[in-house]
Amino acid sequence: MDWKKLQDLLSGVNQYSTAFGRIWLSVVFVFRVLVYVVAAERVWGDEQKDFDCNTRQPGCTNVCYDNFFPISNIRLWALQLIFVTCPSMLVILHVAYREERERKHRQKHGEHCAKLYSHPGKKHGGLWWTYLFSLIFKLIIELVFLYVLHTLWHGFTMPRLVQCASVVPCPNTVDCYIARPTEKKVFTYFMVGASAVCIILTICEICYLIFHRIMRGLSKDKSTKSISSPKSSSRASTCRCHHKLLESGDLEAVPADDKLQASAPSLTPI
């Protein structure tokens, strides 16, 4: 598997991600992909070859191995890493769609026309929803794979001895021994822990996106209210100053008749 191409594809997501997304990407590549490529593949590389059973019955060892390992840990983790990084491609595709739409708009209306998007990679409008759904998909995928891993092997431990009972073509209960169980258990705990960290980071990023969206909406409401309120506030302040001047005696009260005369229009003969 060429992890370098996957890294090159996902490196473009960094410029559209939040701080939590950048940390998530670092955890994926440093603590999961590198550990998978450098160490985990070697530990599980010869697991079927070193799976020993105390029987000479042809085919019994293979059947017992398949009974206990329906799918290998290393292949399950490879699928998990591929599936968990695929939702990030949605963001890249959406940004590419915006850029292409902007390019066609400029070709049609000229270079000096108004832009469709102030910044194609800014998380506003549909791109915000695409980013949010990609995070939800990643969270669901992580949880599903952890559940599958826990269900297939009845936990995250790696036993030294497994027994195959009533499995054809094995004649009776067969004891089988797993190679390097302690080392495999350590790597399993490490990969599960890294997956749990990614789940926490994804939840934090979802909460951050929603909180940031709410705060931005509240700030827009405040700005619209502040634009519409200066006239009323200036009138109120003028009235307060007028009453204070009347109370201090600096301003004489105008009689009602003078007010009427002042407010009445002056009519001149034609």
From Swiss-Prot:
Its main location: membrane. One of its GO terms (molecular function) is gap junction channel activity. InterPro entries: Connexin, Connexin31, Connexin_CCC, Connexin_CS, Connexin_N, Connexin_N_sf. Keywords: Cell junction, Cell membrane, Gap junction, Membrane, Transmembrane, Transmembrane helix. GO terms for biological process: cell-cell signaling; cellular response to retinoic acid; in utero embryonic development; placenta development; skin development; spermatogenesis. Residues 1-20, 99-126, 212-270 are cytoplasmic. It is a multi-pass membrane protein. SMART domains: CNX, Connexin_CCC. It comes from the Eukaryota. The chain crosses the membrane at residues 21-40, 76-98, 127-149, 189-211. The keyword Oxidoreductase does not apply. Residues 41-75, 150-188 are extracellular. GO terms for cellular component: cell-cell junction; connexin complex; cytoplasm; gap junction. It is found in: Cell membrane; Cell junction, Gap junction. One gap junction consists of a cluster of closely packed pairs of transmembrane channels, the connexons, through which materials of low MW diffuse from one cell to a neighboring cell. Belongs to the connexin family. Beta-type (group I) subfamily. A connexon is composed of a hexamer of connexins. Interacts with CNST. This is Gap junction beta-3 protein. It comes from Rattus norvegicus (Rat).
